[in-house]
């Protein structure tokens, strides 16, 4: 079966036509409730084995709050809680994604729940993952697991029963993505293109400084050793400062080899980030180490972050040893 993506306007039209007086939650002013017409619900559903779990991971990366295997009847209470309690506003989460399949309790109540959400003015959309019967059979055979609706019968029987149960939901879906010929990376790109209009083009970068004397980091994609630079610890006027203080930063960055190292490392990171974006890796951690994690590594981390931000990258910085002092 050929790859296919379908975009429909059913969900958006229903939200637009909702009564104006039902589009705002009630709450105390201190709770800062989220207006219902500013809240979004996404249902992730489709054929078992078509990629729902991976789709949920991608949607979570897009900023949605994801709940797996949620009974449809709990959607309304959950939306009400996230809007009227103010928790959505405080956390910045205004988008709820629920993974629902035919095994969810009270699946037959879904149509009524969707109608209720439409009446409330909540923008509700459906992402449906599909694949051909032949591909689904191959996928199940490769993992040697039974289909959830197989019930001791043939695998194809379970697939056909599920396809029949999901017919109406597929017709209502805003996006139908056929994953028959898609790899995991291609599915990710397809989801970004369908839901955001473009694929993931940047990688979020976190840089942290550390001290080798306190142990090597275990969660870094890159580790830079800057102990080749002169150590400000041995300069009495700089010892009690950190790499975030200008005198220390000036001392470190003006040292022989600092600029050349940063130039080369910046270029290497740029090349790697371009490749990571193509390989569907959206988060990269860079560790920069010196002896105690107070001076050289901090100054170099801050400067590397400044350079990468100049390229439009989303970069955060932290100091692992910030609570340790008097360390070289």
Curated annotation (Swiss-Prot):
Which InterPro entries has this protein been placed in?
Answer: P-loop_NTPase, RapZ-like, RapZ-like_N, RapZ_C
Report which superkingdom the organism of origin falls in: Bacteria
Ranges for region Disordered: 1-35
Task: Give the residue range of the signal peptide.
Answer: none
- The entry marks the following residues as binding GTP, namely 101-104
Q: Which UniProt keywords apply?
A: ATP-binding, GTP-binding, Nucleotide-binding
Keyword ATP-binding, does the record have it? yes
Binding residues for ATP: 46-53
Q: Where is the composition biased (Low complexity)?
A: 13-29
UniProt GO molecular function = ATP binding; GTP binding
Is GTP-binding one of the keywords UniProt gives this record? Answer: yes
Which HAMAP family does this chain map to? RapZ_like
Q: Which family does it belong to?
A: Belongs to the RapZ-like family.
**Matches recorded under PANTHER family:** RNASE ADAPTER PROTEIN RAPZ
Q: Tell me, what does this protein do in biology?
A: Displays ATPase and GTPase activities.
Q: Which protein are we looking at?
A: Nucleotide-binding protein BL0705
The root-end lineage is:
Bacteria, Bacillati, Actinomycetota, Actinomycetes, Bifidobacteriales
């Amino acid at each position: 079966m050929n790859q296919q993506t379908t975009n429909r306007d059913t969900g958006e039209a229903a939200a637009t036509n909702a009564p104006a007086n039902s589009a705002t939650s009630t709450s105390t002013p201190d709770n800062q409730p989220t207006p219902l017409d500013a809240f979004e619900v996404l249902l992730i559903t489709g054929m078992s084995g078509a990629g729902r779990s991976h789709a949920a991971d991608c949607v979570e990366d897009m900023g949605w709050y994801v709940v797996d295997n949620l009974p449809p009847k709990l959607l309304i209470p959950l939306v009400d809680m996230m809007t009227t309690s103010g928790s959505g506003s405080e956390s910045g989460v205004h988008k709820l994604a629920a993974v629902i399949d035919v095994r969810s309790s009270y699946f037959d109540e879904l149509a009524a729940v969707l109608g209720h959400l439409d009446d409330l003015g909540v923008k509700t959309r459906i992402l449906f993952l599909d694949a051909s019967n032949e591909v689904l059979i191959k996928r199940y055979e490769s993992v040697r697991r039974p289909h959830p609706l197989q019930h001791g019968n043939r695998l194809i029987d379970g697939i056909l029963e599920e396809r029949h149960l999901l017919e109406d939901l597929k017709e209502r879906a805003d996006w139908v993505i056929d994953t028959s010929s898609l790899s995991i990376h291609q599915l990710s790109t397809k989801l970004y293109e369908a839901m955001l209009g473009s694929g993931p083009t940047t990688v979020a970068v976190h840089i942290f400084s550390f001290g080798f004397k306190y142990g090597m980091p275990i969660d870094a994609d890159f580790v830079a050793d800057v102990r080749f630079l002169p150590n400000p610890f041995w300069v009495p006027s700089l010892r009690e400062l950190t790499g975030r203080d200008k005198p220390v930063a000036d001392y470190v960055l003006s040292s022989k080899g600092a600029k050349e190292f940063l130039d080369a490392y910046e270029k290497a990171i740029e090349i790697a980030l371009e490749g990571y974006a193509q390989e569907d890796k959206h988060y990269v951690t860079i560790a920069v180490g010196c002896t105690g994690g107070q001076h050289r590594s901090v100054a170099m981390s801050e400067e590397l972050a400044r350079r990468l931000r100049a390229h439009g990258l989303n970069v955060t910085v932290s100091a692992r040893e910030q609570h340790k002092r008097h360390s070289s």
